[in-house]
């Protein structure tokens, strides 16, 4: 095997970012670790954790060159690749390389890229070596490199930025909650420099956020740490963008780290929005560039809206007489009148003599009325005698005894 590049990190600089990495670990776990070799001309190589954010978003958790202690390139500049990438989740989905690399117990960490002698000029494998602070434990992680992926941080290098808007934590939280309610649909974002507002629209739902304008241009704003988090912006032109709602919610959540950073929205003329983590002054000088690129979601939203529109199956109204054909005169003949319906014979049944109802004898009715009355009197008499016995109990008569 031939070694192509060697990279050794400052473990203390990586340990400072352990809180930030844990905040974004849920999204970064399924992504890749990438070493940007193009940035050697801009200060040194950069290590980045790259992953997807929702439907149309790309996360870049990039470490500045200040965290690199030593860099050696054993290839010529023409043979060296622009970037090398390998999976963050390795060893049967049981070991997360990024979590181990940004851990606080690591004493030394290095990356070694190498290739087979007959494999060409591009590196094929990577070996991650870590030594821990107990001076005994040591781990090696070896895996194959992934196919070439362009550096995530260079995607917006040639884009023209026309506005930046900083959101305070309370405003970012309300916007994140609103974006989560919209699901994975498209959100139309309008930046208005005349009214100093940003409007977010998804279907019938709409949210308007205002900001305080700054007197500087977009490239001069927010170049250093943020001293005070407030809703301010530097905008020079009107722009309309379309992003995915779930990607917007994920970007706001990732870039809003408590006591570390607040989200900054960067608008580009091509319709792309980049949500960047603006580091606070209280967080200190962290070697971190965290950003989420929100790509244009207009085409996907239009396709979804076209597919969701129901087809109009109701018949169209046509002008009177359309589709009727006039019959020629020589074929028109008067239609015969329908024959009258046959008369049915009617007959009347003879009236039947009414039969008088049998008369009820008078003695039977009197007897039927007298029986219930007698029963009622007997019941009253019995009840009255019972009450008399209860009121006047029977006295026991004593017989005369002559012997007394």
UniProtKB/Swiss-Prot annotation:
Region ranges (Disordered): 302-404
One GO CC term, this protein: viral tegument
Gene3D superfamilies: 3.70.10.10
A GO BP annotation: symbiont-mediated perturbation of host cell cycle G1/S transition checkpoint
Domain of life: Viruses
Region (Homodimerization) residue spans: 1-300
Quaternary structure and interacting proteins, as annotated: Homodimer. Two dimers can adopt a tetrameric ring-like structure. Forms a complex with the DNA-binding protein BALF2, the DNA polymerase subunit BALF5, and the alkaline exonuclease BGLF5. Interacts (via N-terminus) with BZLF1 (via bZIP domain); this interaction may inhibit BZLF1-induced transcription of the BMRF1 promoter. Interacts (via C-terminus) with host NuRD complex; this interaction is important for transcriptional activation of EBV promoters and inhibition of the ubiquitination step of DDR signaling.
Protein name, as recorded: DNA polymerase processivity factor BMRF1
Organism: Epstein-Barr virus (strain B95-8) (HHV-4)
